[in-house]
Regions:
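Metal-ion/cofactor- or nucleotide/acyl-coenzyme-handling active-site neighborhoods
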Residues: 1-256
Length: 256
């Protein structure tokens, strides 16, 4: 069974939650939101949410359950020489894999295989967790892009969160609940909870990213179609294709 068939067998007809790392989740939502996340049949965490150090924060707001970690596994340093790749350790933190839950699916939702380098580094640990790895096929990747483009034209590689929303919808869930990702609509709270990045990674990007939103006229801020994704997210919410939390529902009302 390839990874897409495996995912479809888990997702089709089920209640699915996608939970991202936005800080508003622990600032604006009730402290039983984590229990609500855990009540879904399948929970998908995004990108660097492999391990959360703050267990109280996790339990109350983001949930302790996860079946799939959907990620770009983009461990490369694309933030310039001011950021030390080996200090911020995005996807290269041994602690993440040591604390990985058994039988987790590690899904690279882009048609490449960056995880292979991570796997080589932590093979013994990852194998001990009986984790399943797979990356999307080019065909399904383009099919997902086609779906997103039907809603709003995108001309850059989508973010992990938006790709996973599209992919899950194509797998026909009974319900898809999305929380913890705003496509950088939120200007009140940081885009990531504390300790999502190790060290002062976000601070080093302050010339074009203030921790909340990007300055879209700066070169390093244009590698994803953030503004187009905001329109896609709003369309999905307004047309009842996905369910979202109360804070995110209010945020998308800003989108024209």
């Amino acid at each position: 069974m390839n990874i897409e068939n495996k995912l479809k067998s888990l997702i089709e007809g089920k209640k699915i939650a996608i939970i991202g790392p936005s800080d508003y989740v622990n600032k604006e939502l009730d402290d039983d939101h984590g229990k609500y996340i855990d009540s879904h049949d399948v929970v998908i965490r995004l990108n660097n949410m492999i391990y959360m150090e703050d267990k109280e924060l996790e339990e109350k707001y983001y949930g302790t359950k996860y079946d799939i970690v959907a990620s770009a596994f983009w461990y490369h340093n694309n933030m310039g020489k001011e950021v030390d790749q080996w200090k911020h350790k995005r996807f290269l933190d041994e602690k993440s894999y040591t604390n990985l839950k058994e039988n987790t699916i590690l899904f690279e939702c882009f048609a490449r295989n960056l995880f292979s380098e991570v796997y080589l580094k932590y093979k013994k640990i990852i194998d001990s967790k009986n984790a399943t790895y797979g990356n999307v096929t080019p065909d399904f990747y383009w099919k997902t892009l086609g779906l997103l483009n039907q809603i709003n034209k995108i001309d850059k590689s989508p973010t992990t969160g938006m790709m996973m929303i599209g992919m899950v919808l194509l797998m026909n869930p009974r319900k898809l609940y999305v929380s913890g990702m705003t496509c950088y609509l939120d200007t009140k709270h940081n885009a990531y909870y504390d300790d999502y990045f190790i060290g002062n990674y976000v601070e080093k990007k302050k010339d074009y990213f203030d921790g909340k939103t990007f300055e879209y006229n700066k070169g390093m801020a244009v590698h994803h179609p953030y503004q187009a994704e905001q329109k896609i997210l709003a369309w999905l919410v307004n047309n009842k294709k996905i369910k979202v939390d109360k804070y995110l529902k209010d945020l998308v009302k800003k989108v024209n």
